[in-house]
Amino acid sequence: MLSRRLKQLRLARGLSQDALVAEMGGIVTKQSISKYERGSALPSAVVMAQLARVLGVKSAALWGESVCRVEFVAYRKSSGLGSRDQVRVENLVRQALEERVQLQERVYGLHDELDFPVRRFAVDTLEDAERAAEDMRALWNLGSDPIGNLVGVLEDRQVHVIEIDAPEKFDGISAFALDDEGRHLGAAVVSRRGVPGDRQRLNLAHELGHTVLKIADALDEEKAAFRFGGALLAPRREFTDEVGARRSYVDLGELQLLKRKFGLSMQALLRRMRDLDIINEGYYQQWCIDINRMGWRRDEPAALPPEEPQWLQRTLLRGIAEGALTAEEGKTMLGMEIEDGERLEAIQRRAFLKLPMEERRRLLAAQGEAIAEHYAKDTAWRDAQGGEIHEYDD
């Protein structure tokens, strides 16, 4: 329905009705926009074209019916996100999840109920949240080793990982897509784009907790979700084997090594040690004071690169290849140009060029090290090139 879609797209782009009128060059009034959104009037073809241009969609997208409704699970109670930003975030996520559910139906023919443990694990205590993380690992056959790529694990299990541009106060949110009968068609965990990988991973694991835990009213929901997230990424037995059952001192260098192993920030690692009673409260608080003093709460040293969602790009490319959607539709959803028949390597190359320079340098350096290691181990290439290089004196 035009009225609902118009309002959703406007709010997702953070535009007031006055701002939308200004972006359209004043060809309509604020009152007209209000009537369109209430459904009491319809725009002309000229106005529709301008609305679509400003909102960055095709005119047909404004008339499209939603295949689902989106239900939000929880905001961080301490996020401090303003009401206007909250509305914008909700509409961004609503649009993104609706598009993904529609895409999975068009490309994969998926319209059955989601195979996902929606609020399956009852949690009355924080220890219950710990056990729920162990049960979740068992359900997904994750073993006990650290999870190398959490985003990949989530996407492989039909959880949409959505990244959005949002204020720094926003850390994450989770949501479900449901049909008219209340069946779950999709689940999403949402994180702010641009955060370091260690924070991103805990944010996503925390949001996953909101979707799979049934938390008692008497228990702090955020603490339970964070306990679940920490336990999912650093299982009790594996973590204790690595760190020890009791510690009176933890070195900064060790924390940085553990950060790389478990993919968690130093602050989250220290919290995990405290949760498992590896360190006492006094020592934990002293570390918190030191971290604040050094300005590391938001910007820790040795930051890990963020993990990149792949499902959307992969599904769009498959859909275009199989004729389920056009390159133009793919461009709109992915935010980059896609040519018909374009090779995957070219698309990946342009996606690479959109990364920050520091991240590109890191990836190229890692690739160079891998190639050097390969050639050091495999000497067959020397035979193909005529053997060793010898230097001769004149």
Identify the residue ranges that each predicted region occupies.
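Active-site hotspot residues in diverse enzymes, especially metal/ion-binding acidic/histidine motifs
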Residues: 1-344
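Short, charge-rich, low-complexity interaction segments located
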Residues: 67-73, 343-366
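Short linear interaction segments
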Residues: 360-394
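Generic hydrophobic, helix-prone segments enriched in Leu/Val/Ile
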Residues: 100-104, 352, 375
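N-terminal functional modules and adjacent low-complexity/disordered segments of proteins
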Residues: 208, 265, 347-350, 358, ...
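Enrichment for repetitive, rod-forming helical segments
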Residues: 12-17, 42, 355, 367-368, ...
